[in-house]
Amino acid sequence: MLGDEKEGTSTIPGLNQIQFEGFYRFIDQGLIEELSKFPKIEDIDHEIEFQLFVETYQLVEPLIKERDAVYESLTYSSELYVSAGLIWKTSRNMQEQRIFIGNIPLMNSLGTSIVNGIYRIVINQILQSPGIYYQSELDHNGISVYTGTIISDWGGRLELEIDKKARIWARVSRKQKISILVLSSAMGLNLREILENVCYPEIFLSFLTDKEKKKIGSKENAILEFYQQFSCVGGDPIFSESLCKELQKKFFHQRCELGRIGRRNINWRLNLNIPQNNIFLLPRDILAAADHLIGMKFGMGTLDDMNHLKNKRIRSVADLLQDQLGLALARLENVVKGTISGAIRHKLIPTPQNLVTSTPLTTTYESFFGLHPLSQVLDRTNPLTQIVHGRKLSYLGPGGLTGRTANFRIRDIHPSHYGRICPIDTSEGINVGLIGSLSIHARIGDWGSLESPFYELFEKSKKARIRMLFLSPSQDEYYMIAAGNSLALNRGIQEEQAVPARYRQEFLTIAWEEVHLRSIFPFQYFSIGASLIPFIEHNDANRALMSSNMQRQAVPLSRSEKCIVGTGLERQVALDSGVPAIAEHEGKILYTDTEKIVFSGNGDTLSIPLIMYQRSNKNTCMHQKPQVRRGKCIKKGQILADGAATVGGELALGKNILVAYMPWEGYNFEDAVLISECLVYGDIYTSFHIRKYEIQTHVTTQGPERITKEIPHLEGRLLRNLDKNGIVMLGSWVETGDILVGKLTPQVAKESSYAPEDRLLRAILGIQVSTSKETCLKLPIGGRGRVIDVRWVQKKGGSSYNPEIIRVYISQKREIKVGDKVAGRHGNKGIISKILPRQDMPYLQDGRPVDMVFNPLGVPSRMNVGQIFECSLGLAGSLLDRHYRIAPFDERYEQEASRKLVFSELYEASKQTANPWVFEPEYPGKSRIFDGRTGDPFEQPVIIGKPYILKLIHQVDDKIHGRSSGHYALVTQQPLRGRSKQGGQRVGEMEVWALEGFGVAHILQEMLTYKSDHIRARQEVLGTTIIGGTIPKPEDAPESFRLLVRELRSLALELNHFLVSEKNFQINRKEV
């Protein structure tokens, strides 16, 4: 339990802090820990000894900048140097050299790493903490069976169980179990020592038979018995040193290494005082665990809740990087051993530099960042996405759970999550509850536990002195923690006598005098995504979950706008995301343009480069716009340039637009949305998207591929944008099918395709005549746009393994269109169904047409009423020119606080603007509006307002797809599935029933034969389409029916059909 030095106020911590602290811990502690484990290596004759001197390790500053690493597809890493010594024992000479061990990828200012030019982030994993856990299950007779499970640091398990005769067994595998006496003897204790170290010796003696006595008569016998049971070996194995080594390796190292966390947990659970540096399971632990199990059987002690956070640990960036370093050093050890023996065999004199290679460390880290499930490509759709990605917690990954095996209890919210893991923010689908998000104030403690801050209240005066404490999940159970009214931000408020509080995972109402701690902030138990939802307390949790996920999918718009109604966290999120450019110290602006800002400060002149039209990995456009003028003085921390989706240093993901909640001719049925053409022509929801197209040139067996403009057999129109080298020119407008890079691949022509003169040359002179095949980079369907960047990456040594890469970046401007997805911040999502002319849209009493029409039936059943509060308050804010920042759970101040706030602001707006329709007492919040087509008022008053609406990345341009011809699956001969493979649309059972219901026999036959898997029929269709004529009908069965027949044959079932003649009833058998 840690106290914060500053008493009283608390600020929101840096939201990237978790990643930075983890990496710092790895560099500061993990590196030295792993390097100091590196053993001294000797040759076979024990003449030469190699060792590392850990104290002098050095990490060199990276040779390239972050921006260059991204641009040139390199890794932003630091070189690791260590001093190494080679000692000749006979002459007692030592040669010491500084050696290069390998590259370690560094963390940048965003909390991410750049590997091969790609931003990657390592997410934190939640694992079962090593230690011992007691549980009980009912057997088939309804009797409780108690077990104790010892979990090692590597996740290996050893189970102790007690049967109805009070005998204790250790289960070493699912089928095999051995007596605890045998296990203790194999670990080195004799019977007398066992009985001296247990609380219930008479129970241990009760199941000691003569056969058992023989087994534990000596340590060797016990080890043999244990080996037989563990390895399921028959016969009579003989005791040997190799047998002991195998047991050590397979059992004791895998299942008995507790680590420092496991040792601490076992000491605490079993009341032991074994030193912390003793990280292996000892016989004393086993006996204490058995004693505890016997106590459980007789009703003493408490069972463990496996899902409580005190029984979990966080495996952070530091632990994962340290594990990889250990793996790399183990490989390096093998390399050094091999090199020493090779040098001695060839009678060479080794030096430390010759023995060590940098390959193991560099390749281990590159493969970790590229292949490990917890290392992911940073999602950079918008600033919020970047920052939330680094704060994820996953139960999945190596040593964790899988989406299929995790049960409901693991996925559910637990009381210990309060203030540590957000109860709202998780993924939807198969991983629901397995991927969570850290709460805003949570941090990772030294023992891998999640800690949450609280204010400590002192006895004499519950208000005078207040100190902040960080509690782990095991500590906060002992305190009464106040919630509800005591959360008031103004501490001067007179607290009520009885307050709601939390104690030992129960929610109670207690007197204020009994409270020990109180929460520090209303947002304390939410993640960043959930904290950005205003009026979240009025929403159903499922809709809040959808909203926190959908805000991460919002596309940065060409002209961003701050939200009128927010929560106050927008500025912090934007700052910590690293998207805006910020002044590192005070100074004066000397020069600004779109590419850089130059300012002087502390006697230096600094130039800050700005990001211009950079592509994110979700194809959104990242761009910085300067916000300071030349000659202005700036302070430290001031914003110099806004990034994508930020305005004035605040997060701005969408637009405040005028919305009406009413049905309109069925065009907003079932979550469809009707919009005005103003949103299209006014570029309100226009976004820029940058796509990357790349092509490689290889050296083939026939010769190198060539980049050229001279490509035969292609129309000049397709080559119009190429320069003299055959690469598309910057700034040119390209359409679908245009050539971006002209490339020819050499190939040897077939004998039959030679011209007569070529054959003569070949026969007389033996000259091989080669031709070329056109393999140009063409712009695919839907890729039209402006070429904004071309990069030709030429790697050293143009071999076939090191190809040249040409990348072309094309920018697209996308207006909002029918089929795009929009959403509010309350889980209210919908698809654009129709774009109406502005004169046909419903209009207000002051003549303004609304921009968007939502369906009111989407609100009551989904219980996301927060959108109505936001909608009305947004209207008041736009009329009064105010912005609101609202903390959640404002009902703690008084009842109906949200409604009172909204109505009072609407009333004031109505008075100030002299518009009585803004607040009408008969139906507050609603207004009479008019049909744009007829000018008549609608029958009922309608809710109108200005909510904040986002455009999501699910856009129709990326989804729309049609297939005329394409590839077929080899087995079923049916079209492939999916847009990326040029696949077809599936006609399933239900679609066939629907077509049958309408009686469209010919369409149905087409669907099931020509367009699907009738091979001969579809070839005939192609022929008749080219030469004309009628399409012949398919006669025999399609390929999928033949496949069914073949599968039945594999089960020895023959399927045939018979023709029975009407005249003589003769049967003609026909094979299918």
Curated annotation (Swiss-Prot):
GO terms for biological process: DNA-templated transcription. Its EC number is 2.7.7.6. GO terms for molecular function: DNA binding; DNA-directed RNA polymerase activity; ribonucleoside binding. InterPro entries: DNA-dir_RNA_pol_bsu_ext_1_sf (IPR042107), DNA-dir_RNA_pol_su2 (IPR015712), DNA-dir_RNAP_su2_dom (IPR007120), DNA-dir_RNAP_su2_hyb_sf (IPR037033), RNA_pol_bsu_bac (IPR010243), RNA_pol_bsu_CS (IPR007121), RNA_pol_Rpb2_2 (IPR007642), RNA_pol_Rpb2_2_sf (IPR037034). SUPFAM superfamilies: beta and beta-prime subunits of DNA dependent RNA-polymerase (SSF64484). Keywords: Chloroplast, DNA-directed RNA polymerase, Nucleotidyltransferase, Plastid, Transcription, Transferase. Pfam families: RNA_pol_Rpb2_2, RNA_pol_Rpb2_3, RNA_pol_Rpb2_6, RNA_pol_Rpb2_7. It is found in: Plastid, Chloroplast. It is an enzyme of class 2 (transferase). It catalyses: RNA(n) + a ribonucleoside 5'-triphosphate = RNA(n+1) + diphosphate. GO terms for cellular component: chloroplast; DNA-directed RNA polymerase complex; mitochondrion. In plastids the minimal PEP RNA polymerase catalytic core is composed of four subunits: alpha, beta, beta', and beta''. When a (nuclear-encoded) sigma factor is associated with the core the holoenzyme is formed, which can initiate transcription. PANTHER family: DNA-DIRECTED RNA POLYMERASE I SUBUNIT 2. DNA-dependent RNA polymerase catalyzes the transcription of DNA into RNA using the four ribonucleoside triphosphates as substrates. Belongs to the RNA polymerase beta chain family. HAMAP family: RNApol_bact_RpoB. This is DNA-directed RNA polymerase subunit beta. It comes from Capsella bursa-pastoris (Shepherd's purse). The gene is rpoB.
